[in-house]
A protein has these predicted regions:
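Short, well-structured beta-strand segments within conserved domains
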Residues: 118-120, 130-134, 149, 170-179, ...
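C-terminal beta-rich recognition modules with glycine/proline-rich loops and embedded aromatic residues
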Residues: 18-27, 32-123, 158, 167, ...
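A short beta-strand element within beta-rich, extracytoplasmic domains
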Residues: 131-138, 343-359, 363
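Short strand-edge motifs at loop-to-beta-strand transitions and within beta-strands
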Residues: 161-165, 337-339, 388-392
Length: 429
């Protein structure tokens, strides 16, 4: 997406492209690397109580590790852009530009995003007239100022634009930019109760404990954000919430999270709404925590690394994406697919498969563990419009003394097997 954004900007230099570029750079590219080890993630999870799973130097080394390392040249790639007599300052990154076309050196000094300030110092053998376009970020809603040689410049444009400075530039000229970051929240499209916190362009992650209950925020939706959140004493880029239930959480930039669990999206309800749904919410939360506690292994179909990790195999296999962007796989015309799953050699376990409730009698198949039949399934389409889980008890003699088994779904003749959207091995209750 950054490559595409760069092409779009080259055709039409609009600030909104670089607003996007900046967000992707800090919240995805920078957030994808462990800043202690240099390892990178396969994917960047945003769900509740997620954690980043990094590659290792010798064992977890998938194709995304190569592109994951390539990504980090992007920090320098989009800082500046030029045309014949114009220079665009797109990003606030400490850097030194050798503008050969004009015989000019521009040094940018900043600690952004730790700081809200940046300065540009010009070095040139001869004075020359040209235009410097300095980005006025969409998130800088108050207090944005530019000084040239200590003189404040009049700004008539609004956030989400470029400030154009056309003048005779001399050796030693200095431009100072101040751009206070604004705290704001953004609603997840399609769910008015779910939102994320941002500080300027920086996505904030709530530090979580996996065993904690799910955090919600109780606040009127039109209330000021200062009623929700306040600066933390921990660092100048961290915050702490004020209206969390059952507790408040520390918020730090997502790119700084290399270990521990975190959440990017949180639920928000007005107090009156919360009282109506609280019991249901707590029951769902209890179920999910119990499910996580019992889970020994989890398989996600139609994803390259999970299929590789679980040694996925198949014949007459189809893959796709269903509701809520959940990925699936199925076998057709008597085909089959299999994947390896971890088990407990000392305790009984169950297989849990996730289906789509609309799938009906076309899906008739056998489920086998290490080639031993444990169930024959016929889907009925009785849970329309929703996903559902179904548990299959695995006889203990099929797992006793083993650390892994092969799960196989084999379609009956002219029928389909699946469609599964996930598979779990869980300790039996």
């Amino acid at each position: 997406m950054l490559k595409l954004t760069g092409h779009l900007f080259a055709w039409e230099p609009k600030a909104e492209y670089m607003d996007y570029y900046e967000r992707a750079l800090y919240n995805h590219i920078l957030a994808s690397q462990n800043h202690e080890t240099g390892m990178v993630v396969y994917s960047l999870p945003l769900a509740y109580a997620s954690f980043k799973e990094f590659s290792t130097p010798e064992h977890s080394f998938w194709c995304c590790v190569g592109t994951g390392f390539e990504n980090h040249v992007k920090y320098a790639e989009g800082i500046y852009s030029e045309s014949e007599n114009d220079l665009y300052i797109n990003l606030f990154v400490a850097s030194r530009l050798n503008w050969r076309r004009k015989g000019m050196i521009i040094e940018q000094q900043t600690e952004f995003p730790e700081s809200d300030k940046s300065s540009l110092i010009l070095r040139c053998a001869k004075s020359q007239t040209l235009t410097l376009h300095i980005r006025y970020p969409q998130w800088a809603t108050t207090g944005y100022t530019i000084k040239v040689n200590d003189k404040i410049q009049e700004i008539e444009k609004k956030p989400g634009s470029y400030i154009s400075l056309n003048r005779l530039w001399k050796d030693g000229d200095k431009i100072e930019i101040e751009m206070p970051k604004s705290l704001h929240k953004e609603v997840l499209p399609g769910d008015e109760h779910k939102f994320a916190f941002l500080n300027g362009p920086i996505v904030l992650a709530g530090e979580m404990d996996l065993d904690e209950r799910k955090i919600v925020f109780l606040e009127k939706k039109d209330s000021e954000l200062r009623d929700w959140i306040q600066p933390s004493n921990r660092t100048k880029t961290s915050f702490i919430t004020k209206t969390g239930f059952p507790k408040n959480v520390e918020l730090v930039p997502l790119y700084k999270k290399s270990d521990g669990h975190y959440s990017v999206y949180f639920d928000c309800y007005e107090p009156s709404e919360w009282e109506q749904i609280r019991k249901q919410y707590e029951e769902e939360d209890k179920f999910l925590r119990e499910q996580e506690r019992r889970t020994l292994d989890y398989f996600r179909p139609n994803e390259q690394q999970p299929e590789t990790d679980h040694r996925f195999r198949g014949e007459n296999v189809e893959r796709g994406i269903g509701a809520s962007s959940r990925k699936w796989c199925q076998a057709y015309d008597g085909g089959n697919f299999s994947f390896e799953m971890k088990v407990d050699p000392h305790a009984p376990v169950d297989l849990v498969l996730t289906y789509w409730g609309d799938d009906g009698a076309d899906y008739q198949f056998d489920i086998l563990i290490d080639d031993q039949l444990i169930s024959s399934e016929v889907l009925t389409g009785s849970c329309r419009g929703e996903y559902f889980d179904k548990e299959y008890a695995i006889p203990f003699n099929l797992t006793q003394g083993k650390s892994e088994v092969v799960v196989t779904l084999h379609a009956h003749r002219w029928k389909k097997a699946g469609r599964i959207f996930g598979g779990r091995i869980m300790l039996r209750k």
